[in-house]
Each structure stands twice: as structure tokens, then as C-alpha cells.
Amino acid sequence: MNAPTPNRPDAPAPVGLLAELTHRCPLRCPYCSNPLELDRRSGELDTQTWQRVLGEAAALGVLHVHLSGGEPTARNDIVEITKTCADLGLYSNLITSGVGGALAKLQALYDVGLDHVQLSVQGVDAQNAEKIGGLKNAQPQKFEFAAKVVELGLPLTLNSVIHRGNIHEVAGFIDLAVKMGAKRLEVAHTQYYGWAYVNRAALMPDKAQVDESIRIVEAARERLKGQLVIDLVVPDYYAKYPKACAGGWGRKLMNVTPQGKVLPCHAAETIPGLEFWNVNDHALGEIWRDSPAFTAYRGTDWMKEPCRSCDRREKDWGGCRCQALALAGDAAATDPACSLSPLHAKVRALATEEAAENPPDYVYRTIGSNVRSPLKEEVNS
């Protein structure tokens, strides 16, 4: 799996870099895309290493840097890192919970050239938001933070991860985005990787709820045209075709973890046998072009049928490799979210069954926890 093939496709220039500066976060969201084994503060890259990585990213052709975590403002050097982005001409997007120390650092971030803020909102109702995020009094902090973002003139995107615990609030999220002065709203149905995979039975909505949420979004897009852009990410388990994960494996994006591993996508470490190179040992350009993890599923040569002969193979790039492994037991299989997969009907049935049952309690995201998935036997068995 790891050996680059002699005829491997050339690597296009990456567009975006997700800089996971830390896994520390005041929230404990049960759908978090971070890995189950979270990196500790003691192993995080230092300021100088991040600055070097950003310089290498700019030289490689990266345009956008998403400063993320965890909660990126938990880093004492977040202002220095953001300034480095500005100095290099990299467009910086702060992905934040807006709680803890985020507000206290916002003015300084603006002063050094922060370009954009993406604020997560777990629910419209404060009590529901606190239950989902696992943090008391988070909502007032988020509202105060959002108001300051708008006051400074920074573009604001609200991000709402949708699941059965808040899908009834989709219309409310849209109203909230307008009220807050956001320019964009992401209505992103949960993608079942990381902690969301563990909590799938607690998070899975039913098909009727999903369809209604899509109808609400489409109506709001028309009503609010020119005022609010609404992005919609539909849930894979109810889709006809899969997403192009990260824009296609090793094609557009890369993810640098707090300890310096460079991944083709958030969940890539769930695939056994892949070798992930670290920025402490290799230059970013070398990792992007030649590292075994990035070359493993870049292009189409690795594909099996029906992907290999499908006319969508360079649209969705076979879907998600991590999801194929989780649901089909083979990272090179057709993503079972695709209607052409022999497992597609079983995946839809699994979602329908879980959505019909009473949801179990959330397994909250926690550093140092020994998490085991409560999920039933998967569809590939």
C-alpha cells in the first residue's frame, strides 16, 4: 500500500492547509473530527516549526490556511502564527469555538492581519447547545465573540454541525446567522468519522428529517440571496453519490496535526499500514509529492471496480477512503455511500435502524479517555 508506484500521478499544487495547532479545546462535542487518541500539549509543534511549515506551504502554492484545533486560540502563540500567515500572503481563516480566551485575543489577531473567522455554534437554544458542546455558559460567550468579529469588520462564517440533537433547529440556525451579521452559514450534516463514528447511534437523524432540513436550506437560499450564503453538506449515509473527500486524496488539501504529522484528510490515521511523514523529518513539499500516505490513493490507478470504469471517478475520486475502510473493511473499496457500491443498501438500512432507536448518551470528546465504540457490528461483516 505504501510503496509509490512508478507511474503514480503528478501531485497538483495544494490549495489549502489545515493547521491543527492543538487538540486542546474547552468544548467536548460528540461529533468532533479529531482522532480518538488526542495529541497532548507536551508534544505540540513549537512556534518556529509552525512558522517554517507556513513558509514551505506558501512556497508550495498554498493559498488558504485554516487555523484550527481543537481550539487554536488556546495556543499562546496564535497571534504570532497568524502574523506569519499575513507576512507570507496566506489567507488566514480562524476556526474557533469563540469561548475561553478567544475573545481576549481577537483584537490582536485582527491587528496582525487575520482575514476570516469561522465560528462553531452547536445549537440555537442555549440549553441544547450546552448539552451538545458539553460546556456551561458557552452560548453568551459565542454571541459576544461574534458581535466583536462583526464590529471589527471581519467576515464571519457560522458553522453548524447538524445531527438528530439539533436538526429541528436548522431554520433557527439560519435566522441566527442573519441576526449575528454572518456572511456565510455552513449547514454541515455530521460526517461519521472520529468521535462522530463512536457516537453515530446518538447522532443519526432519520431520512425525513434530513429531507426537511434540505428543503429549509434551499428555500432560505432563495429568500436570502445577496444577504447570506448558505453551504450545505448532506449526510453520506443518505446520499446517492459520495463526496470527493478533501477534494480528492492528495489533490487540494493537507492536514498538519499538532505533533507535525501530515495527513491527506482528518481521519487518515484510521487506515492501518499508511506511513505518515512528519514536518520534523521532511520538508512539506517532499511530503506532499512523495510521502507514502499521499501517493497511496492519489489519482485513479488504485481504484477497483465499479470506480475504475465509472464516469464519476474524477468527480468524487471514489469517495472517502476512511469510510470505505470503516464500512466495507477495505480502504480501496468503493465508498458504501455510493449507490453503485454493493453495500449501499445495507448502509442505508443501518442508518434507518439507528435513527429509529432511542439515542444513547453522548460519548464526549476528552483527552486521555480510553474510548471504545458502542456501535453494532458493521455492514461488511
Swiss-Prot record:
[4Fe-4S] cluster binds at C25, C29, C32. Keywords: 4Fe-4S, Iron, Iron-sulfur, Metal-binding, Oxidoreductase, PQQ biosynthesis, S-adenosyl-L-methionine. Binds 1 [4Fe-4S] cluster. The cluster is coordinated with 3 cysteines and an exchangeable S-adenosyl-L-methionine. GO terms for biological process: pyrroloquinoline quinone biosynthetic process. Gene3D superfamilies: Aldolase class I. Pfam families: Radical_SAM (PF04055), SPASM (PF13186). Pathway: Cofactor biosynthesis; pyrroloquinoline quinone biosynthesis. Its EC number is 1.21.98.4. The keyword Nucleotide-binding does not apply. Its cofactor is [4Fe-4S] cluster. Belongs to the radical SAM superfamily. PqqE family. Catalyzes the cross-linking of a glutamate residue and a tyrosine residue in the PqqA protein as part of the biosynthesis of pyrroloquinoline quinone (PQQ). This is PqqA peptide cyclase. It comes from Methylobacterium radiotolerans (strain ATCC 27329 / DSM 1819 / JCM 2831 / NBRC 15690 / NCIMB 10815 / 0-1). The gene is pqqE.
